[in-house]
Amino acid sequence: MKLTEVTMVRVYLTEGDHQLRKLLDFLHRDEQVSGVTAFRGIAGFGRSGKAHESTLLDISMDLPLVVEFFDLPEKVDRVLQDLNQWVEPGHVVSWPARMNIGE
């Protein structure tokens, strides 16, 4: 199995930020990254300590969202330069990974 180096990135948002569609469009249309997945959390909190969670009594949803994507390190570096201009500091995490590319 052949492997290639990639960079994985996670972007942490909340539904209340209303930035999910903008982020997905940016990653898909503008940057054409290799793979993107969005996850909705059932609970979470950030630096503020304010809990974001779903309950049966809540009508408004402000749940945590995680958008994960990967691509070649050079491309991710370019994407992060643009992304860091409109995503709150401390809400983007990245790390090196390996992706299988066949035999």
Regions found by a protein language model. Name each.
Residues 1-103:
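Positively charged, small/polar-rich N-terminal and surface patches that mediate targeting and assembly
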